[in-house]
Amino acid sequence: MSPKKSPFFELRSGSVDTLLFVVKTTDLDAMRAELTRRFEATPEFFANDVVAIDVRRLAENERVPLADIAQLLDSVRMRPVGVVANPQQAWAAESQLPLLEARDRRGATNAAKSADEDIANAAAAAPAVTAATATPPSDLFELAAGTPENGTPATAAAVEPAPAAEPVRLATSSQTMVVDKPLRSGQRIYAKGDLVVLGLVSYGAEVIAEGNIHIYAPLRGRALAGVQGNHDARIFCTCLEPELISIAGIYRTTENPLPADVLGKPVQIWLEEEKLMIEPLRLT
């Protein structure tokens, strides 16, 4: 006989989207200095974002003090929720943080291309601007999109669901979600396929899609396309003023100013050899 359901709580299996803080060094002082350098200009950027500490890049004989790394992340107002480690990294289980499993989004099968060909063709003759030169990768750590999942009951992390944002009217099909209202700070939209936004994406708002993102209004918040590893995803918007843009985990933030020919302009953004490319759209 199955136990009676409780009216007070439920326990379910599930997955939670987080950032992965990918550790690539055991030098804690260098990591602290790099974190300070990268985020001192935007201390609120990752405020209250949940993050899992990923130590799988470390060599088998290397180990780091996970409690100290958690304190470092706290110092930039991130919220560590667990550790992702290889099976042979048994020392990671000694941390007070729970062990998590994670899907490798980069290894996911790419979705079919579904970019707007008319817009792409209109921009074909425009010069491209690469974003990679503005944000060189760090030898110490990376921040990447990830999806830690609950593992066995002994190691699973319980994460409270975020408060629901104010309802937004959506029109969806099997491939595309349409948002016809402006998004205010704190609102977040996730689309399984492509996402079309007809209103302003304000500072502090976030639009996320497994496919392409089309924004027919200013983008001032965050836009993350191809979040399940689709390197062919693109971002299109009519006015680029973002806090963050990301495709398949490759991202760029406002700590690196955008060139004048794309800032506040209609653009498309795509990945080319692991670099974000930003190109003006010629709409007339």
From Swiss-Prot:
SS bond partners: none
Pfam family, one: MinC_N
Keyword Iron: no
Keywords on record: Cell cycle, Cell division, Septation
One biological process term in Gene Ontology: regulation of cell septum assembly
Xref: NCBIfam families: minC
UniProt family annotation: Belongs to the MinC family.
Cited HAMAP family: MinC (MF_00267)
Quaternary structure note: Interacts with MinD and FtsZ.
Role noted for this protein: Cell division inhibitor that blocks the formation of polar Z ring septums. Rapidly oscillates between the poles of the cell to destabilize FtsZ filaments that have formed before they mature into polar Z rings. Prevents FtsZ polymerization.
Name of the molecule in the record: Probable septum site-determining protein MinC
Species classification: Bacteria, Pseudomonadati, Pseudomonadota, Betaproteobacteria, Burkholderiales
